[in-house]
Amino acid sequence: MPLKLSLKPGEKFVLNGAVVQNGDRRGVLVLQNKASVLREKDIMQPDQVTTPARHIYFPVMMMYLDEVGAEKFYEEFATRLNEFMGVVRNPVVLQDCIAISKHVMAREYYKALMLSRKLIEYEDERLGHVSSGVSAGGDAG
């Protein structure tokens, strides 16, 4: 099933590891086969990895962007997820953590990544006074 991306003028995204930028007009891109695509708003930079949930999101993002080298990010992901689950008591969030782990084990990195956003949202609700990295809505800052 094709993936249709509607792009804003100047919008950047990563396509199979390459940074691509749309021109000065709105555009539509249709991908006919499987590819790793991540919009600029969903990309977290290393200096934005400042909270426990973001320490989960980042290695999942790297596994998604570099499926061939995913194993080098797995240990960091597993360690950080285990730490997070050790302190969280919310059963819904714990179920999300389990689902993220299952998606990663199945190499369904995009699903794991999008579910990891829920952890950031949960964390942002608890630490609302802290503003750093990719927000649950995808806006940096």
Curated annotation (Swiss-Prot):
<comment type="function">
    <text>Has a post-transcriptional repressor function in flagellum biogenesis. Associates with the 5'-UTR of fljK mRNA and promotes its degradation.</text>
</comment>
<keyword id="KW-1005">Bacterial flagellum biogenesis</keyword>
<dbReference type="GO" id="GO:0006402">
    <property type="term" value="P:mRNA catabolic process"/>
</dbReference>
<dbReference type="Pfam" id="PF07378">
    <property type="entry name" value="FlbT"/>
</dbReference>
<protein>
    <recommendedName>
        <fullName>Probable flagellum biosynthesis repressor protein FlbT</fullName>
    </recommendedName>
</protein>
<comment type="similarity">
    <text>Belongs to the FlbT family.</text>
</comment>
<keyword id="KW-0694">RNA-binding</keyword>
<dbReference type="GO" id="GO:1902209">
    <property type="term" value="P:negative regulation of bacterial-type flagellum assembly"/>
</dbReference>
<dbReference type="InterPro" id="IPR009967">
    <property type="entry name" value="Flagellum_FlbT"/>
</dbReference>
<dbReference type="GO" id="GO:0048027">
    <property type="term" value="F:mRNA 5'-UTR binding"/>
</dbReference>
<keyword id="KW-0678">Repressor</keyword>
<dbReference type="GO" id="GO:0044781">
    <property type="term" value="P:bacterial-type flagellum organization"/>
</dbReference>
